[in-house]
């Protein structure tokens, strides 16, 4: 009635020699023999952390004439680091006999190497045509080549052991990551190695400065060309697992060992994912500008200008870019079938950025000044978003397998000598071809609008006293066409299983179509005020306060955007408008320096002698910061929409009159929405705790004559040890909902330090 899978044990629980896989034996033989007593934790080893850092700078200055000057500067740095990967796997040196037999590196676990080479060249020529007309020309380049690789990089380690199909490219050399249950894993380094991103910048610029009457004019041109190779991997050399599955008792699930699984040559799971070859993106942009600082009269100055910018879409030098055509539901390739080298992404030539500012001395006394301004600034899309177009099918390989726990057909279980099928580079074009591979697809908006910022300010500054200044300002900004990533193949709420509802998606057999689209925006409004006291009578201070609000549509519906994430559904992105993840409503800062009124030229103890040396020279300073918390989302611990986003319904505000870290918000104010519907709660509706921090320094200066001074100082960071609580558990239905169990990263406990310094 209840059949069970049985596995016959080997006689005497010893694997017969004819059942030991030769490749499994090879892999087992590269483990070093124990050098410590016991049957576990019986090998100890250590490796040095070796750093070699050198560099130099050169500069040449030359005056061709009194009106023509030139300089050239060159910088170079070469950094090398050979370091243990971590204590858990540090470090397994390759046995000498194994190194003679196989093509292995110096270590079979635990070492990674980093190489960083940077160099830069700058050329500058300045020519004075007239005292009021100057031209400055600049050009140069900068190159960075950071590389991190495993200790056996370049060795055909897997191939020499008999594991075929692993060392298929020059970046897939070395050992695979071999995880053997109950044993230290074998690997020349972390799975994602090697990484070899490279970046080279070339730039040319020219600026003309012209002073004419009340005008200070500046004209200029700027051109940049970048060659970027964001070569990164996730599992270059593959991962092979050898758990107890195939050698334990299937009834009791005991007695197995990963080493036995390795020796019989069957892997219990594996994966690999990597770029076939590095790809090189070329990025170009140029700009010209005109700026006029016009002193209208002694009380009014205007700043008027305009800047025009062009950002050409990225190209790959060998056209290895793929984009998704949402109109025809197909993949397109750079330079093929009439598709541009930028895979359809347009270039925008109307990126004009006007700028206007003014400064007005209201009464002509210099004590009351009003300043204001408005400007538009364009900026290129972050490279990480566009570069992904070269990190998808067919330029990347992704393979994985997980056999049955108790297989009945062992021919379907991958063996260690040939764990993966051959790599085939296929360019799917039709929907059917794409669906057959069932990959994650990435697409970028073909319109490719250029992101830009609009900023505006109005500032009133009033001198209250010769040492005191008060300022109040309004600052606003709006960002348009910010990059936004979301799953365009989103599953909508509905009855039935997730698999059955995929038939209603644009591509039914593809889980995710990640669309990169400049549809996001943000807006900020802030009131800023500060009171400044310049140094007098031993005291100076600055008191500032900001009341602000920042809103956007979220970080990314595909990957989340911090504590406030992205919108609940792409069908109504505007409903995701809410506080930005970095929004802080109130922030106040007080900084001060106070010389205590004791000692020479002070009010008290103003007499020479030891009493003056003891009582005088004391200085107290500090910074006090007060901030409110940041927003966070409320979610559900258990899904109710069969795979669709899980946000709750909000039935009341959800805040508490006296919250504490154990119960920060009212969890009963949020309930699961009805089945197959979206919740009505917004983004970032609740805020985490605020924080107060006191940093204080006490300094004592003792002078000995005119040439020697002894200084003692005591510094206290977070003087009162005030905890900076983090975000609460906001998963409705969780046993710890509303509870805060962490503090903010970057704000430490109280830290005291003392220093003594002698100056002579």
Per-region residue spans from a language model:
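Short acidic-glycine motifs
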Residues: 1-658, 680-760
């Amino acid at each position: 009635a209840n059949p069970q899978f049985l596995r016959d044990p080997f006689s005497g629980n010893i694997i017969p020699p004819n059942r030991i896989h030769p490749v499994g034996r090879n892999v087992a033989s590269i483990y070093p023999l124990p050098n410590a007593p016991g049957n576990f934790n019986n090998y100890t080893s250590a490796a040095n952390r070796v750093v070699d850092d050198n560099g130099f700078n050169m500069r040449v200055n030359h005056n061709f004439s009194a009106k023509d000057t030139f300089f050239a500067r060159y910088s170079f740095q070469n950094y090398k680091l050979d370091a243990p990967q971590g204590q858990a796997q540090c470090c397994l040196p390759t046995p000498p006999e194994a190194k003679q037999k196989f093509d292995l590196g110096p270590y079979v676990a635990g070492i990674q190497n980093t190489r960083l080479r940077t160099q830069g060249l700058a050329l500058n020529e300045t020519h004075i045509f007239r005292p009021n007309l100057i031209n400055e020309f600049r050009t140069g380049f900068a190159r960075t080549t950071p590389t991190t690789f495993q200790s056996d990089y370049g060795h055909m380690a897997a191939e020499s052991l008999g594991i075929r199909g692993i060392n298929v490219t020059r970046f897939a050399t070395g050992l695979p990551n071999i995880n053997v249950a109950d044993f230290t894993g074998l690997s020349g380094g972390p799975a994602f190695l090697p990484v070899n991103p490279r970046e080279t910048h070339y730039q040319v610029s020219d600026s003309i400065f012209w002073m004419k009457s009340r005008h200070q004019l500046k004209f200029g041109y700027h051109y940049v060309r970048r060659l970027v190779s964001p070569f990164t991997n996730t599992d270059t050399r593959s991962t092979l697992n050898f758990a107890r599955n195939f050698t334990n008792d299937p009834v009791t699930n005991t007695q197995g060992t990963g080493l036995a699984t390795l020796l019989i040559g069957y892997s219990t799971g594996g994966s690999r994912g990597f770029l076939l070859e590095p790809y090189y993106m070329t990025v170009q942009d140029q700009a010209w500008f005109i700026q006029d600082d016009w002193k209208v009269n002694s009380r009014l100055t205007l700043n008027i200008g305009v800047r025009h910018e062009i950002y050409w879409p990225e190209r790959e030098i060998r056209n290895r870019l793929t984009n998704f055509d949402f109109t025809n539901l197909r993949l397109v390739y750079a330079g093929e079938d009439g598709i541009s080298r930028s895979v359809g992404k347009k270039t925008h030539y109307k990126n004009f950025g006007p700028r206007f500012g003014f400064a007005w001395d209201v009464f002509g006394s210099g004590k009351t000044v009003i300043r204001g301004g408005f400007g538009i600034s364009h900026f290129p899309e972050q490279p990480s978003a566009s570069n992904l177009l070269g990190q998808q099918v067919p330029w990347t390989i992704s393979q994985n397998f997980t056999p049955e726990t108790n297989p009945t057909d062992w021919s379907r279980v991958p063996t260690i000598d040939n764990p993966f099928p051959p790599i085939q580079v296929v360019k799917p074009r039709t929907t059917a071809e794409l669906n057959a591979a069932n990959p994650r697809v990435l697409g970028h908006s073909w319109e490719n609008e250029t992101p830009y910022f609009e900023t505006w300010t109005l500032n009133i500054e009033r001198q209250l006293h010769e040492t005191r200044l008060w300022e109040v300002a309004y600052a606003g900004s709006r960002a348009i066409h910010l990059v936004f990533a979301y799953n365009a193949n989103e599953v909508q709420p509905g009855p039935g299983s997730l698999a059955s509802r995929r038939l209603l998606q644009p591509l039914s057999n593809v889980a995710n179509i990640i669309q990169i689209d400049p549809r996001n925006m943000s807006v900020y409004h802030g009131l800023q005020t500060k009171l400044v006291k310049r140094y007098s009578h031993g005291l100076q201070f600055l008191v500032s306060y900001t009341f602000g609000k920042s809103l956007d549509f979220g970080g990314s519906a595909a990957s989340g955007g911090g504590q406030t994430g992205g919108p609940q559904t792409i069908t109504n992105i505007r409903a995701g408008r809410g506080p930005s993840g970095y929004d802080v409503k109130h922030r106040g800062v007080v900084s001060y320096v106070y010389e205590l009124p004791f000692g020479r030229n002070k009010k008290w103890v103003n007499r020479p002698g030891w009493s003056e040396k003891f009582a005088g020279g004391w200085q107290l300073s500090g910074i006090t910061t007060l901030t409110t918390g940041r927003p966070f989302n409320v979610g559900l611990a258990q899904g109710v929409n069969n795979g669709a986003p899980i946000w709750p319904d909000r039935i009341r505000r959800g805040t508490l009159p006296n919250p504490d870290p154990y119960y920060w918000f009212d969890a009963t104010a949020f309930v699961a929405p009805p089945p197959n519907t979206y919740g009505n709660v917004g983004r970032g509706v609740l805020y985490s705790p605020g924080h107060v921090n006191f940093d204080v320094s006490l300094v004592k200066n003792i002078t000995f004559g005119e040439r020697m001074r002894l200084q003692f100082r005591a510094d206290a960071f977070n003087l009162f040890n005030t905890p900076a609580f983090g975000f609460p558990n906001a998963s409705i239905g969780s046993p710890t909902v509303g509870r805060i169990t962490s503090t903010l990263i970057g704000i430490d406990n109280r830290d005291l330090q003392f220093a003594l310094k002698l100056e002579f």
